[in-house]
Amino acid sequence: MLNVREVQKLKASNKRLWSLSWNHKGSVLISSGEDRVIKLWAKCNDQLWGSSFSLPEAHKKSIRCVTWSPCGTYIASASFDGTVTIWKISEAHSAPEMEALVSLEGHTSEVKCVAWCPSGHLIATCGRDKSVWLWEFDDEEDVQCVSVLQPHSQDVKSVAWHPHGEVLVSTSYDNKINVYREELDDWTVFAQLSGHDSTVWKAEFSPSGDILASCSDDLCVKLWSWEGVCGKSSSWMCIATLSGYHTRTIFDLNWSPDSQLLASCGSDNRLCIYKMPANGLTHIGGKPCFEEPPVLWGHVPNAHSEDVNCVRWKPGNITDISHSESISNCHLFLTTASDDGYIKFWSIEYEL
């Protein structure tokens, strides 16, 4: 079993925290929430993290999602005010500065999520208006809408990209997961995944790109894969269901950088960590499957005092994570954010 240990706790807000995102180097964390503030967090010394920059009133209403661009130069923030703002980060005068480049307008209600594609040239947004928007972000920092989709019958909760190609997924209150690709210069749904019995809050591809994980109001985490090539003619199927570990809605999940561990969190205040089989995904009769089932490898029953809304693994390898005394034996490192206004930093220790 893992040893999951809290190593730091930061009071980030007096209101709900909803979103966290690490830059690609794992050197800066951003947070956002109900207070409309975007905060950047960096190492104060070898052991502790602290606030390095704070931008109050970044939006007119709550900021539901913040995320770094793949290059680490830009941040996108999605708000209940119906807009998404693209910010440019600079290190002028030895301190971070944020410049608002453009506001993406078009959604007619709350924007719930924003996600950059791996190349950084496409941005996906989704919201309460049941729509998914695709935006092109070019080298001159110009943004234009390239597609508007309304494939769901209810609010769209999240969007996420495949790590190796321009394939997009969205999740919704309609209990469905839609998978999109570009065909003839337009984006279309080429697969719809049914299996959850209630709202699907989040779906995310593993960094290896061969598994899609989803979590739901039905208290289940499901793992999906496909025959053929993702984005081409492929038949999708659920290859595992992880249930019985959360007692209330599962809000978020996130893969570890090596695709071996999956973390989930929810309104039961819990943090759960699952281990994938050591021999990974295999194929029997041409169909993807596990020879052994994924297992719950560790959990924290009361990770926070209130709902845990977000969990994010820190990018990086063992060397750049394990140099400080406080986490000297840590192989991996993750963060959580909660309705209680705290960000928590956790070390994950286990035998290789």
Curated annotation (Swiss-Prot):
PROSITE patterns xrefs: WD_REPEATS_1, WD_REPEATS_2, WD_REPEATS_REGION
Pfam family, one: WD40
Family matches, as CDD domains: WD40 (cd00200)
Biological classification of the source: Eukaryota, Metazoa, Spiralia, Lophotrochozoa, Platyhelminthes
Secretion signal span: none
The protein's name in its UniProt record: Probable cytosolic iron-sulfur protein assembly protein CIAO1 homolog
PANTHER family attached to this UniProt entry: CYTOSOLIC IRON-SULFUR PROTEIN ASSEMBLY PROTEIN CIAO1-RELATED, WD40 PROTEIN CIAO1
Keywords: Repeat, WD repeat
Domain of life: Eukaryota
Disulfide linkage: none
UniProt-listed GO biological process terms: iron-sulfur cluster assembly; protein maturation
Role: Essential component of the cytosolic iron-sulfur (Fe/S) protein assembly machinery. Required for the maturation of extramitochondrial Fe/S proteins.
GO cellular component, one term: cytosolic [4Fe-4S] assembly targeting complex
Family named by the database record: Belongs to the WD repeat CIA1 family.
